[in-house]
């Protein structure tokens, strides 16, 4: 019962946040400089008649009150109608569908690559605590966090194009962007896996398994892997959301036709409907992904369910991730 209530609460919270994002996107359009009528007509106001201007305003609903305009905006949004681009005259929804796949592909590929690299390295760092491999992994993680993604991207692009003289579209528009975004994300996951595993290695469950004569591989797979990975799920939700924002810089650096590239191009041309669409896409994606991550954590983590079922024990059953910083 408590789980159902918690799921409903998170879903309602998601709807409220999406509503706020939609309203902010509407306000952004109204506060933006310039007149959309001028942009649509592609003419100076002095060169068009008053009838043309008024007809365009009526078509856009600009003569209505702000409240009525907001109501029409929300109604159109529910029907996936974001208007048309000032530049190409195409529906904004269709433009987003054309540009979104590459952004989503890069983001999810970055997530997979980061997990495949960081979980094994985090386990190695914890199992070889304070040894050379642990120190090397920690130094690399610190450098990855310290360096901005665009700086890493510039270095990789220089190495591949100038020093190695490799000219490949797949390399420059997929492999390098994924590698650039993965380095920073790997650092956080490695530190979290290492910290959680160091705590678990001292737990009674591990000690009991060793007393029963179980080998280290069995202990790692059956006793340590699940509780080590569970705290990563909320971090993945946050990281995947931030990856979408990070692609704004990376896509422009590597000239990738994704949402980030579209957003910057629309800002330059003051194509406000497309800007609205990009902001809504990024905002909706971040909120939905974080909600899914919260629900997965709730369903998979028994400690979360125990706390929901007995709120009085909330302070007595801390999550691993809450004390992980002391062992970092």
Curated annotation (Swiss-Prot):
GO CC entries: plasma membrane
UniProtKB keywords: Cell membrane, Ion transport, Membrane, Nickel, Nickel transport, Transmembrane, Transmembrane helix, Transport
Single Gene Ontology MF annotation: nickel cation transmembrane transporter activity
Function of the molecule: Part of the ABC transporter complex NikABCDE (Opp2) involved in nickel import. Probably responsible for the translocation of the substrate across the membrane.
Residue intervals passing through the bilayer: 11-31, 104-124, 139-159, 170-190, 229-249, 279-299
Family indicated by similarity: Belongs to the binding-protein-dependent transport system permease family. OppBC subfamily.
Protein name: Nickel import system permease protein NikB
Membrane topology: Multi-pass membrane protein
Main location class: membrane
Biological source species: Staphylococcus aureus (strain MRSA252)
Gene field: nikB
Entry's localization field: Cell membrane
Source organism superkingdom: Bacteria
Gene3D superfamilies given in the database record: MetI-like (1.10.3720.10)
Subunit annotation: The complex is composed of two ATP-binding proteins (NikD and NikE), two transmembrane proteins (NikB and NikC) and a solute-binding protein (NikA).
Domain ABC transmembrane type-1: 100-297
Pfam families: BPD_transp_1, BPD_transp_1_N
């Amino acid at each position: 019962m408590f789980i159902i209530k918690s799921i409903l609460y998170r879903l309602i919270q998601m709807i409220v946040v999406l509503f706020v994002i939609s309203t902010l996107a509407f306000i952004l359009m109204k506060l933006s400089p310039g007149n959309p009528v001028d942009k649509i007509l592609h003419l100076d106001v002095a060169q068009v008649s008053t009838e043309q201007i008024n007809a365009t305003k009526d078509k856009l609903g600009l003569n209505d009150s702000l409240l009525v305009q907001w109501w029409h905006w929300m109604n159109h949004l529910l029907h996936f109608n974001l208007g048309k681009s000032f530049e190409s005259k195409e529906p904004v929804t269709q433009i987003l569908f054309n540009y979104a796949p590459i952004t989503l592909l890069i983001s999810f590929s970055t997530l997979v690559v980061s997990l495949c690299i960081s979980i094994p390295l985090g386990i190695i760092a914890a199992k070889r605590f304070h040894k050379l491999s642990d120190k090397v992994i920690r130094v690399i993680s610190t450098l990855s966090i310290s360096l901005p993604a665009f700086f890493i991207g510039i270095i990789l692009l220089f190495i591949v194009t100038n020093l190695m003289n490799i000219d490949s579209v797949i390399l420059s528009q997929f492999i390098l962007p994924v590698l650039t975004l993965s380095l920073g994300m790997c650092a956080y996951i490695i530190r979290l896996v290492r910290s959680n595993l160091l705590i678990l290695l001292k737990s009674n469950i591990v000690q009991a398994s060793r007393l029963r004569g179980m080998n280290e591989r069995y202990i790692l797979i059956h006793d340590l892997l699940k509780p080590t990975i569970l705290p990563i799920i909320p971090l993945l939700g946050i990281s995947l959301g931030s990856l979408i924002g990070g692609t704004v810089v990376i896509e422009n650096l590597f000239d990738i036709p994704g949402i980030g590239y579209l957003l910057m191009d629309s800002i330059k041309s003051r194509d406000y409907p497309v800007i609205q669409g990009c902001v809504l896409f990024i905002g909706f994606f971040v909120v939905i992904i974080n909600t899914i991550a919260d629900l997965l954590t709730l369903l998979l983590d028994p400690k979360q369910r125990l706390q929901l079922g007995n709120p009085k024990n909330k302070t007595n059953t801390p999550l691993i991730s809450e004390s992980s910083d002391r062992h970092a």
